[in-house]
Amino acid sequence: FINCVITGSMPNEIMISDTTRSTPLKYSFDHCYLMSNPIHSPFIKNVLWGNTRDQLFVRSAINKDGYYDFRPTEESLLRKKADIQISRLPAFCFDMNDIYRLWENAPDIGAYQWPGK
């Protein structure tokens, strides 16, 4: 996972364990926001460890129409923390709303880029 957000209403949204021990667990997190207690692993780098008090999105609670709004706020911890090399790749230089990620030369973590004022 690169430039990803894994969050939710629980204080520990992700746990990594190999219960079978028969095949090595393969994973990697880089430039991500993880709602979890810190996990120490050589496969995890440049991660922001979250907590339930973090205000990341425009609306992280469902509205009356049944929708969330996962665009980052201007003050979001996700702002300007993505891996710029990955964000420069043609497949990732625009967000889910077709906003150019590199307009500030500092892309945001997650599926959406803060659009500016």
Model-inferred region functions:
Residues 1-75:
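Predominantly extracellular beta-rich ligand-binding scaffolds that present long acidic/polar faces
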Residues 75-117:
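Surface beta-loop-beta hairpin patches that serve as ligand-binding interfaces in beta-rich domains
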